[in-house]
Swiss-Prot record:
Residues with Blocked amino end (Ser) modification: 2
Disulfide pairings: none
Domain of life: Eukaryota
Subcellular localization, as worded in the UniProt entry: Cytoplasm
Main location: cytoplasm
Lineage: Eukaryota, Amoebozoa, Discosea, Longamoebia, Centramoebida
Alphabetic keyword roster: Actin-binding, Cytoplasm
Family: Belongs to the actin-binding proteins ADF family.
One record GO biological process: actin filament depolymerization
PANTHER family referenced in this protein's UniProt entry, alphabetically: COFILIN-RELATED
SUPFAM superfamilies listed in its UniProt record: Actin depolymerizing proteins (SSF55753)
Organism this protein belongs to: Acanthamoeba castellanii
Protein name (Swiss-Prot/TrEMBL): Actophorin
Length: 138
């Protein structure tokens, strides 16, 4: 949907995660009037993947960025992962709005390395996200 803005705070928190590793994750939502994407939660640098998942509502959509760390060939890697959480139980209008605004927020958050679209808990499990993050690592 055109006309939905992305707040400057969203870009700032993303850059703090990407450049300064000040946050482990950031979740974003539509504001009350559905005119702007705003920051909802910020997880500190020691937050876990479970902490992050606990911030996602069961019956509504969200965008999120997670600084995913994993081991490959004895070395640690990070992948900045964009997640569109659109659970099956979310209202149709919400799913349509989040899906159609996804490209707008991704254009503002420069440096996303992995994208995950999840409609249920299995698609957002740590194993599923880990598999996606490791997919392009040589």
């Amino acid at each position: 949907m055109s006309g939905i803005a992305v707040s400057d705070d969203c870009v700032q928190k993303f850059n703090e995660l990407k450049l300064g590793h000040q946050h482990r994750y950031v979740t974003f939502k539509m504001n009350a009037s559905n005119t702007e994407v705003v920051v909802e939660h910020v997880g500190g640098p020691n937050a876990t993947y479970e902490d992050f998942k606990s911030q996602l509502p069961e019956r509504d959509c969200r965008y999120a960025i997670f600084d995913y760390e994993f081991q490959v060939d004895g070395g640690q890697r990070n992948k900045i992962t964009f997640i569109l959480w659109a659970p099956d139980s979310a209202p149709i209008k919400s799913k349509m709005m989040y899906t159609s605004t996804k490209d707008s927020i991704k254009k503002k958050l420069v440096g996303i390395q992995v994208e995950v679209q999840a409609t249920d808990a299995a698609e957002i499990s740590e194993d599923a996200v880990s598999e996606r993050a490791k997919k392009d690592v040589k």
